[in-house]
């Protein structure tokens, strides 16, 4: 038993943050509906908000973190982490564990993703009154030179500089994710298809975990029910685009490259 390969019981689900998006939150809760699954929700992204161990953008060594999950989750048939890491950070996992540790990257329509990215920051990232460390970090890494020709802003104009930075993520950070050898899955497809959800689970767990119809009924009943602390929101790409002001339209056209737009179009998104 000492030689048993525990690595293949671990998996990663990546994204460029989930920012309080209900459907992104729904996915790990859905996975955890099976008692043989143990799934973290952005664990290593949230820790720096509360513990002075590292900066918000830093993460533990991912190979060591994989072994840690394998150790503490031995009582589960499968265990994984959602959203602590980005797809472009998984190369060490691929080299160390190969196909034993499986991984998928979850993408979202850019307009909707951007809405939650900005909202998360304008609402102080779920921190209490007076707790500004996370948003202070966000401000400290804004690349102001990139936005000098756009609508001006101050530190207090979080809705402006967060919008610009979110566009930079769409054009740069997410494009790095697309270059990594990983399955990219649209979140919209998972929430609209039980088959695609179960296919993803089968892939991640090497066919070790499945869900009964009653479990799936419960899982999909949560899609439009806010979790603790959430607001009831229904955000559509069309609604978002129509709500933009001129400065937002200008910023989108100047910051998001055509190459980036084409990549999202390739995955079935419309602008």
Identify the function of each model-found stretch:
Residues 11, 38, 102-105, 183-185:
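Hydrophobic/aromatic beta-strand patches that form the interior of the parallel beta-sheet core
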Residues 21-25, 46-50, 87-90, 111-116, ...:
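Short catalytic/ligand-binding loop motif for oxyanion handling, primarily in non-cytosolic enzymes
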Residues 67-68, 124-199, 254, 260:
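PAPS-dependent sulfotransferase catalytic domain
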Residues 70-92:
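Glycine-rich phosphate-binding loop used to anchor ATP phosphates in small-molecule kinases
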């Amino acid at each position: 038993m000492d030689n048993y390969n525990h690595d293949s019981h671990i998996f990663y689900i990546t994204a460029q943050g989930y920012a309080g998006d209900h459907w992104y939150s729904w996915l790990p809760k859905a996975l955890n509906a099976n008692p043989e699954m143990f799934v973290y929700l952005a664990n290593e992204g949230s820790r720096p908000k509360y513990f002075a161990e590292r900066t918000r953008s830093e993460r533990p060594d991912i190979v060591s973190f994989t072994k840690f999950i394998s150790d503490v989750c031995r009582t589960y048939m499968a265990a994984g982490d959602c959203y602590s890491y980005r797809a472009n950070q998984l190369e060490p996992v691929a080299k160390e564990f190969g196909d034993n540790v499986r991984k998928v990257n979850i993408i979202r329509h850019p307009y909707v993703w951007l809405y939650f990215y900005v909202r998360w920051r304008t609402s102080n990232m779920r921190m209490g009154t007076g707790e500004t460390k996370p948003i202070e970090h966000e401000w400290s890494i804004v690349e102001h030179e990139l936005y000098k020709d756009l609508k001006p802003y101050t530190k207090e104009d979080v809705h402006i500089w967060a919008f610009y930075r979110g566009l930079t993520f769409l054009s740069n950070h997410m494009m790095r994710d697309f270059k990594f050898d990983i399955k990219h899955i649209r979140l919209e497809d998972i929430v609209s298809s039980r088959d695609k959800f179960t296919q993803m689970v089968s892939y991640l767990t090497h066919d070790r975990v499945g869900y009964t119809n009653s479990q799936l009924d419960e899982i999909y009943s949560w899609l439009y029910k806010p979790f603790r602390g959430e607001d009831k929101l229904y955000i559509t790409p069309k609604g978002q685009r129509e709500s933009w002001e001129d400065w937002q339209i200008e910023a989108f056209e100047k910051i998001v490259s055509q190459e980036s737009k084409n990549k999202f179009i390739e995955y079935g998104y419309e602008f």
